[in-house]
Amino acid sequence: MPVRVSEFSWQQTPATIFLSLPLRGVCVRDADVFCGESYLKVNFPPFLFELFLYAPIDDGKSKAKIGNDTILFTLYKKEPVLWDSLSVPGVDKEMMQRIREKSILQAQEKAKEATEAKAVAKREDQRYALGEMMKIEEEERKKIEDMKENERKKATSELEAWKECQKKADGQKRVQRKEKPLEGKQAEETKALKPRGLPRKAPPTRLPTRGRNWENIFPEKLKEDRVPAPRSAGSIQISFTPRVFPTALRESQVAEEEEWLHKQAEARRAMSTDLPEFFDLKEEERNPDWLKDKGNKLFATENYLAAVDAYNLAIRLNCKIPLLYLNRAACHLKLKNLHKAIEDSSKALELLTPPVADNANARMKAHVRRGTAFCQLELYVEGLQDYEAALKIDPANTVVQNDAEKIRNIIQGTALKSRD
């Protein structure tokens, strides 16, 4: 039975109560204080102090200061009046019990409201952070699009200027071609109109219509305006170099590696963007790779809930990409959703088949994350199995080796305790 304390001192003003309670040599760390509107309790074993207040107080503003083997309470009254006494007179056991229960229920409700308010504030902060990040990305995308548009306009204007120069040059060439035949014809006419001498019989002159000048002038124009004949058709043979994996020939897994490449190609084609629920999304938001990169950025900023949302949407668009499940498992580990982390790691391992060198790192991470989730659930044997599977993939990984050794020590220590 605790020893009830009745030694204390108090003073009051119309708005405040000042209460001093000695701790009687008890360590300050062992003192437990509970304060409600009508009830005050201090438990400092083996002593117990209870006070059923005369009138309600504002327990949210009231304060307690512990020091020098004394607790100093500053209690703020709800109504600024002087009290006749500090505690309610004539309180029986039933009334005390009712006041205790009522105070405890009020404290629980306030704690619940505070927790809910904190959760709402946290969600609002996360939503605000996600909105700000999306706004920044939208501004960057718009800036890039503006740069592209400016470059396109610049290239278009340069092309138009070049076309205009070409038109002017072609016009000048056509004018020069027209002037050359006229000059030749004028020269022939001038020669034909020269005066002839009387004593000498002039030879008969020929008209320049079908003479040598005809053959010299118009064939040049025809040669210049002649269009070359079209080229003969042909065919070009194209062959692609085969993809070669960096694997020794004695350890080669050509069939498995080809199967893995085939599965990767099928996974890239397995898109579900034609569903009605995705019509409102932007073009980049329908791209699983873009969503995966966005989830990675959110994970790096420790916004794990938003990262899970990004991976969820990417998986709904394409459920055949193993890295989406692997990254979402890492988020669930951070959020302590251990069973979901195990499910996502198992799904990633299911998609990372057949086992080849190209997916070895991803398989190792999947085993480690599933083993970590098992260990946090205190299923150390299952966790050790996953860590050993990871070591088979990457035997030189010292971090995984150290973690596996710690798990073995835990299992051996548990076995020794059970024997004792």
Swiss-Prot record:
Region annotation Mediates interaction with ESR1 and STUB1: where it falls in the sequence: 7-103
InterPro entries in UniProt: CS_dom, CS_DYX1C1, Dynein_assembly_factor_4, HSP20-like_chaperone, TPR-like_helical_dom_sf, TPR_rpt
Keyword annotations: Cell projection, Cytoplasm, Neurogenesis, Nucleus, Repeat, TPR repeat
Signal peptide: none
UniProt domain CS: residue ranges: 3-87
GO biological process: cilium movement; determination of left/right symmetry; epithelial cilium movement involved in extracellular fluid movement; establishment of localization in cell; heart development; inner dynein arm assembly; learning or memory; neuron migration
Residue windows of the TPR repeats: 288-321, 322-355, 364-397
Region spans: Disordered: 164-212
Compartments where found: Nucleus; Cytoplasm; Dynein axonemal particle; Cell projection, Neuron projection
Basic and acidic residues: bias regions: 164-192
GO MF term set: nuclear estrogen receptor binding
Family annotation (PROSITE patterns): CS (PS51203), TPR (PS50005), TPR_REGION (PS50293)
Pfam families noted in UniProt: CS
GO cellular component: centrosome; cytoplasm; cytosol; dynein axonemal particle; extracellular region; neuron projection; non-motile cilium; nucleus
Subunit organization: Interacts with ZMYND10. Interacts with ESR1 and ESR2. Interacts with STUB1. Interacts with DNAAF2. Interacts with CCT3, CCT4, CCT5 and CCT8. Interacts with DNAAF6/PIH1D3.
Functional description taken from the UniProt entry: Involved in neuronal migration during development of the cerebral neocortex. May regulate the stability and proteasomal degradation of the estrogen receptors that play an important role in neuronal differentiation, survival and plasticity. Axonemal dynein assembly factor required for ciliary motility.
UniProt protein name: Dynein axonemal assembly factor 4
Annotated source species: Mus musculus (Mouse)
Taxon lineage: Eukaryota, Metazoa, Chordata, Craniata, Vertebrata
